[in-house]
Regions:
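Non-catalytic cap/lid and distal C-terminal segments of serine-dependent acyl enzymes
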Residues: 3-7, 13-243
Length: 243
């Protein structure tokens, strides 16, 4: 083994310089000043493993659309069952819209979890609902006021977005579900009966136990009814698919 004297100190200094440079780039006098697609890997306490996020920041260039003035809003954007944290950047114009409408977009990785706590699986619900906002708020100096924070997703991600927003109504101004699985009880019954080839009954049982029955807090239809008369409930919009 070859030992390089001073190697550890050099690496440490380099990491500090990179960290300071990134934080200066992300925030100058409290305002985001770069356009960036940040991809990061970090250890999650809730997941008990390393996971990935993508984060888009609006920029100051005028090549596509002028920069929107004011404090950027924050959108947590969730992927579907067969996707991952790269889904939105690969298959949509999300970076363009982030700049046009002045959003910081945070896209986490959740595998095929349905954003559940998991009876025998991994606690993706508390990771996305609680740990991820705390980490990103600290790293990127986000304005995390309720009126500045939104969540959305498609398919499985639409279900996750609604479930998270309605279980944390104090955190989100609005939630959008694109072809989201909102009749989640009906969906789990269909999968348990073997009537959907894209998911096995065993996956549902790993979320909800042998009976495969979701609890009330995991059922968007129950949550919508529960919060119907709450004046402080998040605004909700559901887009249906064409299939």
């Amino acid at each position: 083994m070859i030992r390089m004297e001073g190697q550890s100190n050099s690496i440490a200094i380099m990491c500090v310089v990179i960290n300071v440079t990134l934080m200066y780039s992300f925030q100058i006098k409290g305002k985001i000043k770069i356009m960036g697609l940040f991809t990061g890997n970090f250890y999650s306490k809730n997941l008990r493993m390393t996971t990935q996020i993508n984060v888009i920041f609006p920029d100051v260039s005028n090549d596509v659309t002028p920069l929107y003035e004011g404090t950027p809003k924050v959108l947590y954007l969730l992927h579907g069952l067969s996707g991952n944290s790269d889904e939105w950047t690969r298959f949509s114009k999300i970076e363009y819209y982030a700049k046009k409408y002045n959003f910081i977009i945070i896209m986490p990785e959740v595998q095929r979890s349905f954003y559940t706590t998991g009876k025998v699986g991994i606690d993706y619900f508390h990771y996305v609902a609680d740990e991820l906002p705390a980490i990103c708020g600290k790293w990127f100096h986000l304005d995390q006021r309720r009126e500045n924070t939104f969540i959305a997703g498609e398919s499985m991600g639409g279900y996750g977005a609604v479930k998270i927003a309605l279980n944390r109504p104090e955190k989100y101004e609005a939630v959008a579900s694109l072809s989201g699985v909102l009749d989640y009880v009906g969906f789990t019954e269909m999968v348990l009966a073997g009537n959907w080839e894209d998911m096995s009954p065993q996956e549902i049982q790993s979320f909800h136990g042998e009976a495969g029955k979701p609890e009330e807090w995991e059922n968007p239809l129950f949550l919508v009814e529960k919060l119907a008369k709450d004046e402080n409930r998040p605004r909700l919009i559901q887009f249906c698919g064409t299939e």
